[in-house]
A protein has these predicted regions:
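Mg2+-dependent phosphoryl-transfer enzymes with acidic/Ser/Thr/Gly-rich catalytic loops
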Residues: 2-12, 28-29, 184, 199-281
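Asp-based phosphoryl-transfer active-site loop
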Residues: 9-25, 100
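Active-site metal-binding loops of divalent metal-dependent hydrolases
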Residues: 21, 75, 230-232
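Short, acidic loop-to-helix structural element flanking the phosphoryl-transfer center
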Residues: 26-42, 89-96, 149-153, 205-217
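Short, structured coil segments at secondary-structure junctions
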Residues: 64-66, 74, 82, 186-187, ...
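Conserved acidic, metal-coordinating active-site core of Asp-based
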Residues: 107-109, 114-229, 233
Length: 281
């Protein structure tokens, strides 16, 4: 029985990126890349399952041979990269997003959105990113993955685009905690975080676990053959539902409690270690 647990029939692996697959310096190590390549060569589907938008996914990941699928914006979108096709979506209606902007204005926060596969950020926030306590490597990601626009409300009215995710950054922790408490009470929203000073808003039923399950159904892969690795609050459902749920040693304690296995840290190639532990690669 113990041997059976160590070597399940893993056929689909969902990997969070920041704090999980990538090092703290946002690097994919050669060994981790090699392990992912071995999985894909063996017919195991490996995919990023991230809070990032499509334009924020590093090309060195998507260009790995055989890397076909990606889960974006905490599960709001599942893409088939090979066919350039959306397989599944679970977004916030644009009209509802407009209403939420009025609520967000009551907080001292930077906010922007993911929609149409890209990030959209008002100039007033984009030009002052450094004032919201954002780490340098995240600041760089924000600047390279967002489109600068003058008025988010007008953009929404013109494009009528479903919103994959709303991002918020806070300079003060007390402001973030207040927003987390208050926004968390709104029934049609799911409020999570992946960084020390951010909040991420999705529709209430949107999460990485739901997206993984739907991709599993599309690919005819049962839950028990799904493996998921993560470190943060926004990985909870994915790690909990997976047949093999893996939490990083550097991850949230609540995530470790629902995981089947706690691996090494992201700076110790914990993803590669976990995959080698459970898969014959």
């Amino acid at each position: 029985m113990e041997q059976e647990k160590k070597q399940p029939d893993v056929r689909l692996i969902g990997l969070d990126l920041d704090g999980t697959t990538l090092t703290s310096d946002k690097v994919l190590t050669p060994h981790t890349k090699e392990v992912l390549e071995k999985c894909l060569a063996e017919g195991i589907q490996v995919l990023p399952a991230t809070g990032r938008v499509k334009s924020g996914i590093p090309e060195y990941l998507t260009q790995i041979e055989g890397m076909r699928y990606v889960i974006l914006s905490n599960g709001a979108s599942v893409l088939d990269l090979k066919e350039d096709k959306v397989l599944y979506q679970n977004c916030i209606p644009w009209e509802r997003a407009l209403e939420l902007f009025d609520v967000l204005e009551t907080y001292d926060t930077f906010y922007d959105i993911y929609a149409l596969g890209a990030g959209w950020c008002e100039v007033r926030f984009y030009d002052n990113v450094e004032n919201y306590g954002i780490e340098k490597h995240i600041e760089k990601l924000v600047r390279t993955s967002r489109n600068r626009i003058d008025d988010l409300r007008e953009w929404m009215k013109e494009n009528k685009a479903p919103v994959e995710k709303i991002n918020m950054f806070f300079a003060k922790e007390e402001d973030r905690q207040r927003a987390f408490r208050e926004l968390g009470k709104i029934e049609d929203l799911a409020v999570t975080c992946s960084l020390g000073n951010n909040l991420e808003i999705n529709g209430a039923t949107c999460n990485k676990g739901d997206a993984m399950l739907n991709l599993g159904k599309i690919l005819d892969i049962p839950i028990e053959s799904i493996m998921a690795c993560g470190d943060g609050n926004n990985d909870f459902e994915m790690v909990k539902m997976a047949g093999v749920g893996v939490a990083m040693k550097n991850g949230e304690e609540s995530l470790k409690e629902v995981a089947d296995f706690v691996t090494k840290t992201n700076d110790e190639e914990g993803v590669a270690y976990a995959i080698e532990h459970f898969c014959n690669v």
